[in-house]
């Protein structure tokens, strides 16, 4: 991949906000515009075969994915020892908002975040890119409330049958077919993650928090019941399939747990968390669901609750240290 040459003096490093095994992240500014940016300095010398593949993927896919709901790749340039990726700086994310119990989520807030998530996802899927690591702390929030997909280090292109890794997507947001070793998949894996995020926005806590890969399947089955025989039959063809004892759906179904949700929310959630990945809606089909046309209308991004500033910068830093690796991470009107 050709790396565009840029004058390294175009950017001023202000302070380090995080460090992983292969990268250091600085808060900085673009000299000419005084714009705040995040500067990822990737230590090229750490990789005997050149640059880490996740860095190249992030650059490639962000170049192909310019959209209001995808983090902007501002610039890329290299020095003798580092590859420098310049990104727009976003000091808040959806996880911060979910965890802040002093912030009250209104149904219109949740609908707005879901619209922006699905719009960004539809955009990358239309360019045959799977994200493969959707979760609340990879959904960043701008100063004017716009949600943006970030952290494309696990992304890859799709379209023709290929042998893809099943060891992707953070456990709590990973669909069951990947635990069973499925290596040929499409947009359905991202849509399962979106369903888990939708549930988390309504519950204000992770919906399917398994403690291990094996436990994760048990958590999913206890929450949704075991799959129907037709789906089990297709799962039996997967290399890591494990026999499962029948578990019925919980009493009252999803409606009992999501008691504040309406029929539209429950219907969309069930579609996204379908065991059959081919029955899960695409991002565009989800945007066309009647949930988004029903009242209330989604809140305008500028009116959404948000956090940021120093607290957000500290969160970015601690998140990168926890990962200890590179990288960090429909026609609907708002009212």
From Swiss-Prot:
Top class in the EC scheme: transferase
Alphabetical GO biological process terms: cell division; positive regulation of transcription by RNA polymerase II; positive regulation of transcription elongation by RNA polymerase II; positive regulation of transcription initiation by RNA polymerase II; regulation of cell cycle; transcription initiation at RNA polymerase II promoter
Domain Protein kinase: 11-292
Primary site of residence: cytoplasm
PROSITE patterns: PROTEIN_KINASE_ATP, PROTEIN_KINASE_DOM, PROTEIN_KINASE_ST
EC number: 2.7.11.23
Keywords associated with the record: ATP-binding, Cell cycle, Cell division, Cytoplasm, Kinase, Nucleotide-binding, Nucleus, Phosphoprotein, Serine/threonine-protein kinase, Transcription, Transcription regulation, Transferase
Keyword rRNA-binding belongs to the record: no
Reactions the enzyme catalyzes: [DNA-directed RNA polymerase] + ATP = phospho-[DNA-directed RNA polymerase] + ADP + H(+)
InterPro entries attached to this UniProt entry: CDK, CDK7, Kinase-like_dom_sf, Prot_kinase_dom, Protein_kinase_ATP_BS, Ser/Thr_kinase_AS
Subcellular locations according to the entry: Cytoplasm; Nucleus
Sample GO molecular function, one term: RNA polymerase II CTD heptapeptide repeat S5 kinase activity
Record-annotated membrane-spanning stretches: none
Residues at the active site: 133
Lineage: superkingdom: Eukaryota
Positions with a binding annotation for ATP: 17-25, 40
Subunit structure: One of the nine subunits forming the core-TFIIH basal transcription factor. Interacts with mcs2 and tfb3.
PANTHER family given in the database record: CELL DIVISION PROTEIN KINASE, CYCLIN-DEPENDENT KINASE 7
Annotated function: Protein kinase essential for cell proliferation, where it is required for completion of cytokinesis. Phosphorylates the C-terminal repeat domain (CTD) of RNA polymerase II.
Family the entry assigns: Belongs to the protein kinase superfamily. CMGC Ser/Thr protein kinase family. CDC2/CDKX subfamily.
Protein name: Serine/threonine-protein kinase crk1
Organism expressing this protein natively: Schizosaccharomyces pombe (strain 972 / ATCC 24843)
Gene name per UniProt: crk1
